[in-house]
Amino acid sequence: MLVILRSVVLFVLAAVAEIGGAWLVWQGVREQRGLLWIGAGVIALGIYGFVATFQPDPNFGRILAAYGGVFVAGSLLWGVVVDGFRPDRWDLIGATICLAGVAVIMYAPR
């Protein structure tokens, strides 16, 4: 159970780093907030690259495939919290399907 908890925490940290980093770059470029925002985004994206290496599963492909589902759900949540985005039912259904896929890929008994 602790291994699963560790894995979930690492997925959340990875999502914050990647989504936050991409959002900072977006703000720097699209919203013309400047190079400091872009630089902070690049650093956050670099941190994301390291976080996945701490996952307990040794398979890069499995971790990144599962993280894709976390990214989908996390991006929608980021939009709600940070940008005032309101997902519709299809967004929520899609995110739920993605998270179910994460659970199967990462935590199914092998």
Swiss-Prot record:
The chain crosses the membrane at residues 8-28, 34-54, 63-83, 89-109. This is UPF0060 membrane protein SACE_5620. HAMAP family: UPF0060. InterPro entries: UPF0060. It holds the Pfam family UPF0060. Belongs to the UPF0060 family. NCBIfam families: PRK02237.1. It is found in: Cell membrane. It is a multi-pass membrane protein. Its main location: membrane. One of its GO terms (cellular component) is plasma membrane. Keywords: Cell membrane, Membrane, Transmembrane, Transmembrane helix.
